[in-house]
Amino acid sequence: MTTLAIDIGGTKLAAALIDKNLRISQRRELPTPASKTPDALREALKALVEPLRAEARQVAIASTGIIQEGMLLALNPHNLGGLLHFPLVQTLETIAGLPTLAVNDAQAAAWAEYHALPDDIRDMVFITVSTGVGGGVVCDGKLLTGKGGLAGHLGHTLADPHGPVCGCGRVGCVEAIASGRGMAAAARDDLAGCDAKTLFIRAGEGHQQARHLVSQSAQVIARMIADVKATTDCQCVVIGGSVGLAEGYLEQVRAFLMQEPVPYHVALSAARYRHDAGLLGAALLAQGDTL
């Protein structure tokens, strides 16, 4: 059965057709609407899906935010242009005319990456560092979503009680410091207004402030991983996202994690499916894997 998989992120929307063997075809991307209206997201999704829907039998959505009974509830509304409450499943069922499943993007990615690991791995955590910071937890071979869909939102754990205010309302969240948006917000002087991609370029050129911002992000993520190891005793952690997969970033996270006491060490690896993990995980779930 062919699935129309959709990935809704803070900066881009992606869609593709995925067959029963998880082969991806006709991948398309559009920027996430900058305007803060449900209509803008609805129209963007319609434009994304329209060329693909005739060849699909079902829709699977991986989206940033909390998915609760088919509704998209943004824990940090800034990551989706201010959206607080959006009828995601209903909207796609109307646009595509197909049965639709929705799950958090990091949870979906965790499920895809879990299936790529050796069979003896039963406990793993996926972390995405991108516009925001998210996560997905697989425990004893089962994906944890939580009754309210909140499970795995690791970016909203505490990094610095005196840090910046996060879009979720807490002070000093991991996401507020380590995410691409958090790094950009902290940039000053000649880096003010730069996005995360530019900060990585400048860091590679030796710019002191840019190097500090990247290093600070990596250290915050490493400390969060130590907390995750203490909480879940996971066998491995897989890292994805545009920041997480940036050149040299994983190596910095690994170096900072090695500075933590030995019980908190855990194997780290880059996402095998890279930017397609959310699409593939959602398709896996729609094709019969249960939450």
Swiss-Prot record:
Example GO biological process: N-acetylneuraminate catabolic process
Catalytic activity reported: an N-acyl-D-mannosamine + ATP = an N-acyl-D-mannosamine 6-phosphate + ADP + H(+)
Pathway: Amino-sugar metabolism; N-acetylneuraminate degradation; D-fructose 6-phosphate from N-acetylneuraminate: step 2/5
Enzyme Commission designation: 2.7.1.60
Stored InterPro entries: ATPase_NBD (IPR043129), ManNAc_kinase_bac (IPR023945), ROK (IPR000600), ROK_cs (IPR049874)
A single MF term (Gene Ontology): ATP binding
Binding site for ATP: 5-12, 132-139
Binding site for Zn(2+): 156, 166, 168, 173
Keywords (A to Z) from UniProt: ATP-binding, Carbohydrate metabolism, Kinase, Metal-binding, Nucleotide-binding, Transferase, Zinc
Quaternary organization: Homodimer.
Function according to Swiss-Prot or TrEMBL: Catalyzes the phosphorylation of N-acetylmannosamine (ManNAc) to ManNAc-6-P.
PANTHER family the UniProt entry points to: N-ACETYLMANNOSAMINE KINASE (PTHR18964:SF169), ROK (REPRESSOR, ORF, KINASE) FAMILY (PTHR18964)
Family affiliation: Belongs to the ROK (NagC/XylR) family. NanK subfamily.
Protein name listed in UniProt: N-acetylmannosamine kinase
Organism: Salmonella heidelberg (strain SL476)
